[in-house]
Amino acid sequence: MKVLVLSDSHSSLRFMRKCVEKVKPDAVVHLGDHYDDGEELAESYPQIPIHQVAGNCDRYRCPIHAREMLCYALGGVMVYMTHGHRERVKSGIGYLTAEARRYGAQVALYGHTHVPDCHREEDGLWVLNPGSAGRSAGVLETDGQAVTSCYLLTETDLEDMV
C-alpha cells in the first residue's frame, strides 16, 4: 500500500493535487492545519480514502467529531497520526515517539513544525513529518506487514507537472 502523507496545507490545494497525481496513492493522510483542505481533496478524489486529524489551526475549521490523534492499522501497519501540537513536537519528538510506542505503533506521523523529517529510530519505529504542503510531502509504503519505504517529496520532485 502506498500512502501519501500531507500536513499544514494552509490552502495549498494545487500542490496537494500534484502530489496525488504524482504518487498515485492508495490512501492519503492529512495531519491537520486546514482540515477542510483534506475534505476538499476527498471530494476531488472520491476513490482514495482520506484519513485526517485536526491541527492547532483547525478549531473552527473542522467538524465537531474530528480527532486530534488517531492510531489504527493502515496498509497492515499500526500508524500513530497526530498534528503534533499536543505532543509539543516543536520542543522535540520524545513525547511523540513515547506515545506512538505506547499505542504499539510501527509508524509515527506528525506535522506542526513545517520541517520535513523521515527517519527510523533505533528500535525500528518510523517517524515521518511531511513538512508543510506547498513545499513538501511524505510517502509511506507497506507490504501489508511492515514499512518497505518511507521518503519525502519536495517541490523539485513535482516541477515537471503542470
Where are the predicted features?
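N-terminal active-site segment of His-dependent metallophosphoesterases
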Residues: M1-Q47, D58, C62-H65, T142-G144, ...
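Active-site neighborhood of phospho(di)ester-bond hydrolases with catalytic His/Asp-centered motifs
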Residues: V5-S7, A27-D33, H51-N56, Y80-H83, ...
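Active-site environment of divalent metal-dependent phosphoester hydrolases
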Residues: H10-R14, Y35-E39, C57-C62, E87-G92, ...
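Pre-active-site segment of Zn-dependent metallo-hydrolases
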Residues: S12-C19, M81, E87-A100
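Binuclear metal-dependent phosphoesterase catalytic core
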Residues: F15-K18, G75, A98-G104, E121-V162
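A short helix->loop->beta-strand "cap" motif at the edges of active sites that frequently abuts
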Residues: P46-P49, G124-L125
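Helix-adjacent hinge/juxtasegments
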Residues: P49-K90
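Charged helix-capping and loop-helix junction motifs
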Residues: H65-M69, S91-E99, L125
